[in-house]
C-alpha cells in the first residue's frame, strides 16, 4: 500500500486551520475526516457537532448514523432533507470505512446541499483518493488526513497540547 506523503506536522497544521475556521463559524458543506489517528478525527467531529447548531436545534437537525448499520443511499437521502426550524442540518457519519457503497456518496459530495453539513469520520485507513467520493469532498468541502505521530514527535506535541489547555509539563 502506498504512503500518502502526509506527515504528522501536516495533520496538526490542518487540524489547527480547521479549528480556526470552525471557531469563526465558517463551515464547509462536507468534512471528510480520515486516517489512522483517531484523536484528531474524534476531536474535530465533536467540535463540529457542538458548534454548528445551538442546543435547542440539535434534537431536530443533527443526525448520527453508523457505517455498519447504514448504506450510502440512506445517507444521501438524509443529506437531501431540509433543516427543521434552523439554518443547517448536520449529518454525522461515523465508521464510514464500514459503509456499504461508500463511493456512492459521491452523488452527494459532488453537489452538496447548502443547508446540510455532512461530517464523514473514516478511521483506521484513508479513503481512496482516486474515488469520486474523495474528489467531491476535496473540491466541495474540507479534508483532514490524520496520520499517527512517530515516537519522536509525541513529546513535543503533548507539551504543545497541554500548554494550549493552560498547564505546563516538564520532560
Feature-to-residue mapping (PLM):
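Non-catalytic interfacial helical region
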Residues: 2-16, 24, 31, 39-171
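P-loop (Walker A) phosphate-binding loop of NTP-binding proteins
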Residues: 36
Amino acid at each position: 500500500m502506498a504512503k500518502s506523503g502526509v506527515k504528522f506536522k501536516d495533520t496538526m497544521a490542518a487540524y489547527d486551520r480547521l479549528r480556526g475556521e470552525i471557531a469563526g463559524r465558517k463551515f464547509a458543506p462536507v468534512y471528510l475526516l480520515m486516517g489512522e489517528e483517531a484523536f484528531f478525527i474524534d476531536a474535530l467531529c465533536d467540535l463540529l457537532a457542538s458548534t454548528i447548531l445551538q442546543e435547542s436545534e440539535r434534537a431536530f437537525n443533527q443526525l448520527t448514523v453508523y457505517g455498519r448499520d447504514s448504506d450510502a443511499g440512506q445517507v444521501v437521502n438524509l443529506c437531501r432533507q431540509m433543516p427543521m426550524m434552523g439554518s443547517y442540518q448536520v449529518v454525522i457519519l461515523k465508521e464510514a470505512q464500514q459503509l456499504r457503497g461508500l463511493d456512492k456518496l459521491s452523488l452527494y459530495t459532488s453537489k452538496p446541499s447548502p443547508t446540510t453539513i455532512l461530517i464523514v469520520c473514516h478511521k483506521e485507513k484513508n479513503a481512496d483518493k482516486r474515488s469520486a467520493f474523495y474528489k467531491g469532498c476535496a473540491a466541495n468541502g474540507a479534508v483532514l488526513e490524520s496520520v499517527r505521530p512517530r515516537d519522536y514527535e509525541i513529546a513535543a506535541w503533548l507539551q504543545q497540547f497541554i500548554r494550549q489547555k493552560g498547564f505546563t509539563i516538564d520532560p
